[in-house]
């Protein structure tokens, strides 16, 4: 669902569920002159807060480590961006929130 959302927005999907160091990035995509590393969080309700709140400092560090590995392994010459896609289901219907440039490295 998140990958299709990004494709509909004009992103080129490069990878899904790319792994390094026993960690994973959900989606790697190109958006214009940026390579975008996307974390996707889904919740069935908001009892535990918004899905994007689960992207804490530790999760950001994992994403950054995997992104760094991908960046150097593939010799990327693009600007790097970290996005979060939050999918929250209300009565069975998904509400998608795309947070562009959600964080910078491991703030």
Regions found by a protein language model. Name each.
Residues 73-107:
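Domain-level recognition of nuclease-like catalytic cores that cleave nucleotide substrates
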Residues 47-78:
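Mid-chain, well-packed structural core segment of small domains
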Residues 25-44, 55-57, 63:
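Conserved catalytic cores of phosphodiester-cleaving nucleases, focusing on short active-site segments
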Residues 1-16:
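Acidic-basic catalytic patches of nuclease active cores, encompassing PD-(D/E)XK
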Residues 44-46, 88:
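Feature marks short, surface-exposed loop/turn motifs that line or immediately flank catalytic pockets
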Residues 20-23, 93:
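Short acidic/glycine-enriched loop/turn segments that link adjacent beta-strands
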Residues 6, 63, 82:
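Residue-level signal for inorganic ion chemistry
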């Amino acid at each position: 669902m998140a990958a299709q959302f990004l494709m509909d927005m004009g992103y080129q999907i490069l990878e899904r569920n790319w792994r390094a160091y026993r960690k994973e990035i959900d989606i790697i995509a190109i958006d214009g002159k940026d390579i975008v590393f996307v974390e996707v969080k889904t919740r069935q309700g908001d009892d535990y807060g918004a899905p994007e709140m689960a992207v804490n400092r530790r999760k950001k560090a994992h994403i950054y480590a995997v992104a760094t590995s991908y960046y150097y392994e593939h010799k990327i010459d693009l600007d790097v961006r970290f996005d979060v896609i939050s999918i929250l289901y209300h009565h069975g219907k998904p509400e998608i929130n795309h947070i562009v440039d959600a964080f910078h490295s491991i703030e």
